[in-house]
Every structure is written in structure tokens, then in C-alpha cells.
């Protein structure tokens, strides 16, 4: 994950292929916080195939905010919304209508698609039309079509790409639970 975070500086598009329980949502949450606290004005929007997926990222954001050494400021609501100022906020949502993505314009716009393999190309294109300064897509490479597949394969030259293997997570490497909630050695054995 460290190499992914380092690659964000100066990147325009980042695609992360990952297995289940490998830390994608943890990573996305830290990127959201970093983005808003290092730029002003700044807007971060994130979406996914379901509101539940959006709320998982939000839960990770709230946990990171709670565990921060110093208060991060702003107002963090129960819904996926963190507001530092009128022109400095993070908002997560899921929609079945691509046109509802419109309206979030900012010179420092970060757009994230979590579980991107489950989001259709129309939603991806709606996000692109916002002109994000940085676009991050994360997901399980489960399908042989769609924008995530294209980013990882035929359009790879337009993206900074990364892979997080479940086999590289601390719990699997150390064969014990180091980080609760991540893939475990037992999980890997069960799937053989």
C-alpha cells in the first residue's frame, strides 16, 4: 500500500487490482483524508456499486479521524460527508443514474470508485466529465470487460497500476491475525 500512496503524487489516474479483504477501503479512506488536508480548496467524491460499499469507505474514514493524534477539523456526519468548508469537503454516494454524479467541480477534485468492477462505464464516464485532478479506481479484477479491466490491460499506458495480492497481506504472511478484518491464512486455505 505504501507504493500506491507514493504513486499518487503527480498521478492523474491510478488503478488498483486487489483481492478481497486486502485493504482497499482502508487505503481509499486515508487518501480522502490526505487529499482534503493537503489542498484548499479541495473536493473528494467517491462512489461504488452500492451505498453499502460507499459506507464501508466512510466507516474507515471515521475510524481514521477518531484515531488521529490531533483533531482533523470540520464536521463529519453519520452519512458519508465530511465538510471542512463550503469548497473543501468529501462526499460519498451511490446512484443508479449517472447524471446525478454531475455538479462536483473543483480545481482539486479527487474522484474514487470503490469496487470498480461493479460500476458500469456510464458512471465512470460521468466521473471523467467532472475533470478530476486525480481519479482512483479500486476493485477485484473479476470481469474481462469494463473500465477497470481496460485500465489494467489495454489502457494501462494511461494509468498508474498496482496489484494488492491477498497473499501479501500481513495476516497471511505471518499466519496469524495481525490486522483484524483482513484476509487470514485460514481464509486462503479454505479457498484452495
PLM feature spans:
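Phosphate/NTP-binding elements of NTP-utilizing enzymes
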Residues: 1-192
Amino acid at each position: 500500500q505504501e507504493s500506491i500512496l507514493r504513486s499518487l503524487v503527480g498521478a492523474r489516474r491510478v488503478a488498483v487490482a486487489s483481492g478481497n479483504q486486502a485493504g482497499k477501503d482502508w487505503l481509499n479512506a486515508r487518501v480522502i483524508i490526505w487529499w482534503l488536508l493537503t489542498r484548499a480548496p479541495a473536493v473528494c467524491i467517491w462512489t461504488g456499486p452500492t451505498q453499502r460499499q460507499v459506507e464501508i469507505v466512510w466507516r474507515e474514514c471515521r475510524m481514521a479521524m477518531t484515531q488521529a493524534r490531533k483533531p482533523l477539523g470540520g464536521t463529519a456526519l453519520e452519512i458519508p460527508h465530511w465538510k471542512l468548508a463550503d469548497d473543501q469537503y468529501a462526499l460519498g454516494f451511490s446512484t443508479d443514474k449517472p447524471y446525478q454524479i454531475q455538479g462536483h467541480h473543483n480545481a482539486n477534485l479527487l474522484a474514487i470508485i470503490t469496487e470498480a468492477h461493479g460500476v458500469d462505464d456510464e458512471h465512470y464516464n460521468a466521473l471523467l466529465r467532472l475533470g478530476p485532478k486525480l481519479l482512483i479506481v479500486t476493485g477485484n479484477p473479476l470481469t474481462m470487460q469494463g473500465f477497470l479491466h481496460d485500465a489494467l490491460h489495454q489502457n494501462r499506458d494511461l494509468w498508474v497500476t498496482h496489484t494488492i495480492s491477498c497473499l501479501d497481506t500481513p495476516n497471511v504472511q505471518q499466519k496469524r491475525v495481525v490486522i483484524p478484518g483482513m484476509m487470514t491464512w485460514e481464509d486462503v486455505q479454505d479457498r484452495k
